[in-house]
Amino acid sequence: DAAAFPLPDGAAQYTADAELVAYASPLMHSPGPVFTVRLPEMRLPQPLRHVIVLEGVQDPGNVGTVIRTANALGMDAVVLTGACADLYSPKTVRAAMGALFRQPVLTCATDELLQLLHARGLKLYGAALTDAAQDLRRVPLSPAAVAIGSEGRGLSAQLLAQCDGQIIIPMQPGAESLNAAVAAAVVMWEIARTGM
C-alpha cells in the first residue's frame, strides 16, 4: 500500500510488479519500497598526494576491500577505470564496510584519469610483473598514484605505456601473483609506512 510509505515533498512514487522489484533488490523478501537517488558529485581532496587506481578489477569484493583498506591507511582517493565492478553493487558495499561513505572514490575513463593526475602533478606507477618493474621499496611513492590491474590480466598495455614507472612487490621465487586487493593493500601499506 503506497500510503504506508510517506515520501518527502517532490519525490515521485511508482508501483512496480514483483519481477521488477526482484531485479532491483538483492533481498529475497523485500521489506517494501525500493528507491533511487541521485549520487552527489565526487570532489577529490586538496592536496592529492596518495591515490590508488584500479583498472578492470571486476570482483566487487576486491573493489570494496581496496576502498576499505585505502580508508584505513589514509589514501587520499581511489580511482576506478576500465571495466571495474559496480561501485554500488551489494557485494562492493558490504566489502567496503562503510568506508565507501568516507573514502573519496572516483570512476572515470583512462584519458580523464591521466589528465587528472597530470593536472595535480602526480606521477603514475603501474604494478606489473615485468622485467622493467622496480622493487616498490626503492621507488618514491609519495606523492604518486599507483595502478593495480585486473585479477586475470593485470594492467592493460595502454595504461602501462602511460605510466611514469613500473613497480613490483618482491615475493619468494615460485610464488603466484597476489590478487588485486592484496597487492593494493601491500602497496598502500608501503605508501603509508614511507610517505605519510
Regions found by a protein language model. Name each.
Residues 18-24, 111-115, 132-133, 174-175:
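A short acidic, often aromatic-flanked loop/helix-cap motif at beta-alpha or helix-coil junctions
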Residues 125-175:
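Active-site/ligand-binding-proximal alpha/beta "capping" segment
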